[in-house]
Amino acid sequence: MAHKKGTGSTRNGRDSNAQRLGVKRYGGEVVRAGNIIIRQRGTKVHPGNNVGRGSDDTLFATIDGIVTFERKGKSRKKVSVYPA
């Protein structure tokens, strides 16, 4: 008869790293070309003037300027960058 307990196994103990999504530059902030404005999954916010969209839906500035959040119709949001 065993005089030590067998060690049990657990089905827990895993967790994924946070994705660090969200707005990185807010309205009125000055950005340089290439700065990331929003990291997102899907097009929660659409690219407007002078804003590009990466393959993972990241929005980034294509020119130096000031970030502006706008509406595109009733429900769509967009972000644009205008020269300072």
Curated annotation (Swiss-Prot):
Gene Ontology BP annotations: translation
Biased composition (Polar residues): 7-19
Pfam families membership: Ribosomal_L27
Region (Disordered): 1-23
InterPro entries linked to this entry: Ribosomal_bL27, Ribosomal_bL27_CS
PROSITE patterns xrefs: RIBOSOMAL_L27 (PS00831)
GO molecular function terms listed in the Swiss-Prot or TrEMBL record: structural constituent of ribosome
UniProt keyword terms in alphabetical order: Ribonucleoprotein, Ribosomal protein
Entry GO CC: cytosolic large ribosomal subunit
Signal peptide from the UniProt entry: none
Disulfide bonds: none
Highest taxon, organism lineage: Bacteria
PANTHER family, A to Z: LARGE RIBOSOMAL SUBUNIT PROTEIN BL27M, RIBOSOMAL PROTEIN L27
Similarity field: Belongs to the bacterial ribosomal protein bL27 family.
Name this protein carries in UniProt: Large ribosomal subunit protein bL27
Species this protein is from: Acaryochloris marina (strain MBIC 11017)
